[in-house]
Amino acid sequence: MIDHFIMNKLPLELVYYLTNWLKDYDKRMLLSTCKNFLSLQSCVYYEDIYYYEEIHKLSYHQMFRKVELELCKFKTPIPKIVTNLEFDVYFNEPLINRRIKIRNKWVKIRKIIPSTVKYLDMGYSFNKSIRGALSYGLTTLIFGPEFNQPIDNYIPQTVTYLEFSVYFDQPVVGYLPTRLTHLIFGTDFNQPIKGALPDTLEYLYFGWAFNQPIDFALPPNLKCLKFGHCFDQPIKGFLPLGLEKLIFEAEYHQPMDLAIPESVEYLKLGNPGSNSLENCLPINLKTLVFGENFNENLNTLSLDKFRELEKIEFDGFFDQKISSRITIDNVIKSNNFIETFQNFYGMIKYYFNDFINPNRQYLPENVKHIIISTYLYDKICSNISNDVFIEVYN
């Protein structure tokens, strides 16, 4: 049992210091051990996510950094100490000039979102103007699928992470924050980007519909670049020389020979079209992923010169024999193999839909791990060696 006399003798400075190392629940337990400690409640921050209705009547409600506020009860001010704010799936209310209740009086305030907020997730349904609603100091801004409003110069320059979702398709040239490091566009975005992207940008993801020219449009510090299913614009001479990760989600029909910088270590190809695959690959490549549309014969592919290559992954419906010439010691994730393959350690998942004949060597002896569905488990488990670990998913 705690000796309350001894606890009361502890310096408050020491107790305050100890709370920095405790989880929220333990903080509350410690501060409730004696009356003397209760004075620290208004000095200690709480980091977990709390429902607004649970904490707004507490005398120290301003010490909760992360508050979840239900739309139907959005009638009182959001605490000005909140740093992380996420709206729920139904929220679609104006962010400025809103009437709220303060001390039993209805008043009109210009901004709903406190200037203390650093992380803001607008939720699924939000699709209102953001003009004048966001404060300087915001660093992370995430819009949900329904948002498709002009951004003009409404996003603070302090934002470093910006994410748009499904329906956003508005002009961005001249409107993006100059400190951005991460920029994600959703499914429908297909606007010009030349002159739009800041030099600080390191991660850039385009969605399904994007198919705009990228000539001299990409910033020099870009490290990761992802193109969606519709992209089919020239890239030769336009990719940053320091690029490390490049993703094509679908077929690409533009010339690729020597177009990808040697700095690229991770490359995903949906389908290189008429391009020579061997001439597409950068010399320092470590991971090569073939996308869902790739089903080309690899018998002519020589990987001897790619000495850094560690991993090959087939991410779709690949269904070809793999030549014994490809003998690198790596991991291959193959989704749809029906043919035999040799000299590889690998995993089979998702679309495999064939019986494994126990009288025929379908799997190399060094395969140790297979991922299959519950549906297939009963079909094939009895024909697989007991040395192979079988992981089952629904």
Swiss-Prot record:
InterPro entries: FNIP, LRR_dom_sf, STK_FNIP-Repeat. This is Putative FNIP repeat-containing protein R636. FNIP repeats lie at residues 126-167, 168-207, 210-250. Signal peptide: none annotated. Keywords: Repeat. PANTHER family: FNIP REPEAT-CONTAINING PROTEIN.
